[in-house]
Amino acid sequence: MQFTTILSIGITVFGLLNTGAFAAPQPVPEAYAVSDPEAHPDDFAGMDANQLQKRGFGCNGPWDEDDMQCHNHCKSIKGYKGGYCAKGGFVCKCY
């Protein structure tokens, strides 16, 4: 009776040590360095509205989906057969 109790406690402690429940806490990583905004000029500064609209590949939300535009975009990428608008119509998913 005592042997099984000691064995079960030992297995429990060993299992908790392996899962990291009693492990020492890891140090918190330093905050990421944010670069100066003037060091990287705005990428969209020289683009007109037509160029910015093309970046969504037709998936501009659930009420403004153009699956064919997304499908044609994915077909233009080597290795993909087509695509569709996913994640509520905001993401062009290629297959």
UniProtKB/Swiss-Prot annotation:
Binding site for beta-D-GlcNAc-(1->4)-Mur2Ac(oyl-L-Ala-gamma-D-Glu-L-Lys-D-Ala-D-Ala)-di-trans,octa-cis-undecaprenyl diphosphate: F57, G58, C59, D67, H73, Y84, A86, G88, C92, K93
InterPro entries per the UniProt record, alphabetical: Defensin_invertebrate/fungal (IPR001542), Scorpion_toxin-like (IPR003614), Scorpion_toxin-like_sf (IPR036574)
Domain of life: Eukaryota
Outcome of mutating G88 to A/C/D/E/F/H/I/K/L/M/N/P/Q/R/S/T/V/W/Y: Complete loss of antibacterial activity
GO biological process, one term: defense response to bacterium
GO CC aspect terms: extracellular region; host cell plasma membrane; membrane
Function: Antimicrobial peptide that potently acts against several species of Gram-positive bacteria. It selectively inhibits peptidoglycan biosynthesis through complex formation with the cell wall precursor lipid II (1:1 molar ratio) thus inhibiting cell wall synthesis. It does not disrupt cell membranes. Is especially active against numerous clinical isolates of S.pneumoniae, including all 90 different serotypes and isolates resistant to clinically used antibiotics. In vitro, shows considerable selectivity for bacteria over mammalian cells.
Homology family: Belongs to the invertebrate defensin family. Type 2 subfamily.
Protein name: Fungal defensin plectasin
